[in-house]
């Protein structure tokens, strides 16, 4: 995969070099590049200007963004604009992006964008209903969530297939050694070696956690008969 990031602050992305993203680069699975679009700005390197019609704040000008993307060697890339008004990013969207060969992220600053920038864009994406000072943190989050899904980036395919949200449910509780830590013990079923009982326990606990913490996920999750029965049992216990 090839990722190009347009930003005024490329140094902010340094932590990615020591993360799973850096390992993907080392393995040759990812080519990631940062472009300071101020370098392509006309008018004394100014990237922003006042909005026509008046109003608060400054807007990113279209010219530096267009000229920077024109110089990127890309073949039909997915172009993502980080915008609080965009569609909310989630796990299914990360899985979708992980199937792409080329991605471009545009990180904004100031009050907003010249609307004409959006003519370049395929996706307008937000992390949620809040505003950050810039798009860099959002881009780092999305890149990390996407890159870890590229085949062979992390050790085992199943290790991310069982993640919370990948299955549509929150992940079940997990334990490691020691068995007894300060009086808190591992559930006996996990020590039993009975694979079917373990599978059913994990499913029940996954449903329980989802029901208690994110019931909205269950509204769109297609329950099978076993899951319906377990969920009914959980509700009776409440």
From Swiss-Prot:
Gene this chain is encoded by: trmD
Family statement: Belongs to the RNA methyltransferase TrmD family.
Location in the cell: Cytoplasm
InterPro entries on file: Alpha/beta_knot_MTases, tRNA_m1G_MeTrfase_C_sf, tRNA_m1G_MeTrfase_TrmD, tRNA_m1G_MTases_N, tRNA_MeTrfase_TRMD/TRM10
This protein's UniProt keywords: Cytoplasm, Methyltransferase, S-adenosyl-L-methionine, Transferase, tRNA processing
Molecular function GO labels: tRNA (guanine(37)-N1)-methyltransferase activity
Keyword S-adenosyl-L-methionine: yes
Assembly behavior: Homodimer.
Disulfide bonds: none
Domain of life: Bacteria
Lineage of producing organism: Bacteria, Bacillati, Bacillota, Bacilli, Lactobacillales
Protein name: tRNA (guanine-N(1)-)-methyltransferase
Catalytic reaction list: guanosine(37) in tRNA + S-adenosyl-L-methionine = N(1)-methylguanosine(37) in tRNA + S-adenosyl-L-homocysteine + H(+)
Catalytic activity, EC: 2.1.1.228
Binding site for S-adenosyl-L-methionine: 108, 127-132
Entries under CDD domains matching the protein: TrmD-like (cd18080)
A single GO cellular-component term on record: cytosol
BP GO annotations: tRNA N1-guanine methylation
Reported function: Specifically methylates guanosine-37 in various tRNAs.
């Amino acid at each position: 995969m090839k990722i190009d990031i347009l930003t005024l602050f490329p140094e902010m992305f340094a932590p990615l070099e020591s993360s799973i993203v850096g390992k993907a680069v080392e393995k040759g699975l990812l080519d990631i590049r940062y472009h300071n679009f101020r370098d392509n700005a006309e008018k004394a390197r100014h990237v922003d200007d006042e909005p026509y019609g008046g109003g608060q704040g400054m807007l990113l000008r279209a010219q530096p963004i267009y000229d920077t993307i024109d110089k990127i060697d890309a073949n039909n890339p997915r172009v993502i604009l980080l915008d609080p008004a965009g569609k909310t990013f989630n796990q299914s969207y990360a899985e979708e992006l992980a199937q792409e060969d080329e991605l471009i992220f545009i990180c904004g600053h100031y009050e907003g964008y010249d609307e004409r920038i959006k003519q370049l864009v395929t996706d307008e994406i937000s992390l949620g209903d809040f505003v950050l000072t810039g798009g860099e943190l959002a881009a780092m989050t999305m890149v990390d969530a996407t890159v870890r899904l590229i085949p062979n980036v992390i050790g085992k395919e199943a290790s991310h297939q069982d993640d919370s949200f990948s299955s549509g449910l929150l992940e079940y509780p997990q334990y490691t050694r020691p068995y007894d830590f300060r009086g808190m013990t591992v559930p006996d079923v996990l020590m039993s070696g009975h694979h079917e009982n373990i599978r059913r326990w994990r499913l029940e606990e996954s449903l329980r956690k989802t029901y208690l913490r994110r019931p909205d996920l269950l509204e769109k999750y297609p329950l099978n008969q076993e899951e319906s029965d377990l969920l009914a049992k959980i509700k009776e216990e409440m």
